[in-house]
């Protein structure tokens, strides 16, 4: 009986305003979690280094591991918000359409990186206020959102990754520059689709891990509120 009270009482006592505040605050925490997860995944180079072995990228591309790693590192540094120069691969030529696409990709990543810088302090204030007021429903909403959306995307990816990949590019990029020609933009040969799928999986795992933290905070505050 006591477990039911712990779980339900904070939600049952919510007013309409409280529900709105919980959902809005939960969305902010979720967006912060997504921005941080994307930024971490972008800079987590060991994932790519592992895929170099698992996906046999050297064999499929025809380039040595040293060349692949060097050019990949250049690409990651370019996508960092602190990098202000143009993209120049040490060993790969690049077409004008390829250059434009990478500029667009950098803008997309910048949204998440700047989003993380803005939302981290905002979320910290929100979390401290929720703990002070014992507003556990905020964490409940954040946890539910952080589970529901990644789970839905995960099902889509598991069902048809190629469709998800293509649809994402069509929505985000208003051109077909993302369709690389390996002869004019050989960098695409070291960036297999499977690597991006693994990146998506890591992002979702990080978000789901964050959702567990939200649920743990909700349960802890729910117990304190009952006492």
Can you say where each PLM-predicted feature lies in the sequence?
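Alpha-helical transmembrane signal-anchor/signal-peptide segments
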Residues: 42-60
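Terminal transmembrane helical module of multi-pass membrane proteins
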Residues: 177-227
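Individual transmembrane alpha-helix segments
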Residues: 80-118, 194-203
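Juxtamembrane interface at the cytosolic side of transmembrane helices
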Residues: 12-23, 120-165, 213-227
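Juxtamembrane non-transmembrane "cap" segments at the membrane-aqueous interface
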Residues: 159-182
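Hydrophobic secretory-pathway targeting helix
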Residues: 2-48
């Amino acid at each position: 009986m006591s477990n039911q009270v712990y779980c339900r009482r904070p939600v049952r006592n919510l007013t309409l305003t409280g529900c709105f505040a919980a959902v809005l605050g939960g969305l902010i925490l979720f967006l912060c979690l997504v921005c941080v997860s994307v930024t971490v995944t972008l800079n987590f180079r060991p994932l790519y280094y592992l895929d170099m072995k698992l996906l046999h990228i050297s064999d499929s591309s025809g380039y040595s591991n040293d060349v692949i790693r060097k050019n990949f590192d250049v690409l990651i540094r370019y996508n960092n918000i602190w990098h202000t120069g143009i993209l120049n691969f040490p060993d790969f030529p690049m077409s004008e359409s390829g250059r434009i696409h990478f500029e667009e990709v950098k803008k997309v990543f910048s949204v998440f990186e700047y989003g993380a810088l803005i939302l981290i302090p905002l979320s910290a204030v929100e979390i401290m206020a929720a703990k002070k007021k014992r507003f556990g429903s905020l964490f409940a909403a954040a946890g539910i959102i952080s589970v529901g959306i990644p789970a839905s995307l995960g099902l889509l990816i598991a069902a048809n990754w190629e469709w998800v990949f293509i649809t994402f590019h069509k929505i985000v990029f208003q051109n077909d520059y993302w369709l690389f020609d390996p002869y004019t933009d050989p960098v695409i040969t070291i960036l297999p689709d499977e690597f991006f799928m693994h990146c998506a999986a890591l992002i979702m795992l990080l978000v789901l891990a964050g959702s567990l933290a939200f649920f743990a905070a909700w349960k802890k505050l729910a117990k304190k509120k009952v006492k």
